[in-house]
Amino acid sequence: MLNEILNILKADSELYSLLGANVKDSHIYMNNGKADTCISYKYSSITSDGIKVQSKLEINCISPDYAKAESIFNRVKQLLITVGNRQLNNDILNVALNGGGSLYIEETKQHIIKAYFILTIRERMI
């Protein structure tokens, strides 16, 4: 499921532009950011009942410019959050924002907007 989420983020031209991404570098990284303006993420499973899995996606929108970090965060929300009965795709049934916050790292002069998304995913136990 993580690959499907990453594909949605990487395929969006508006997010691509905000991140200053290029063909060789999407500026979307696992665990730690590697560019001044980027997204870093962590992914983990929370619960499973054999029918549905809940997973947590932690997203960090990072930029020296707070307004840009906020724009990146808002675009990620637009791309991922499911409204009403809308599913993200056939397997990802629901995506909801479940907390977050912002901080400023003095040493690197970077603003970080952190968001926790909860994904409800169809599970196929065989």
Task: Describe these PLM feature segments.
Residues M1-I8, S44-Q54, N94-I126:
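Short, charged interaction patches at domain edges and termini
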Residues M1-T47, Q87-L88:
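Small/polar-rich, solvent-exposed N-terminal microdomains that initiate assembly or binding
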Residues S13, S17, G84, I121-M125:
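Secondary-structure transition/hinge residues
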Residues D36, Q54-K56:
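Extracytoplasmic
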Residues N60-I62, T120:
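Short hydrophobic/aromatic beta-strand micro-patches
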Residues A67:
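Catalytic phosphate/metal-binding cores of nucleic-acid and nucleotide-processing enzymes, i.e., regions
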Residues K77-R86:
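A common structural junction motif
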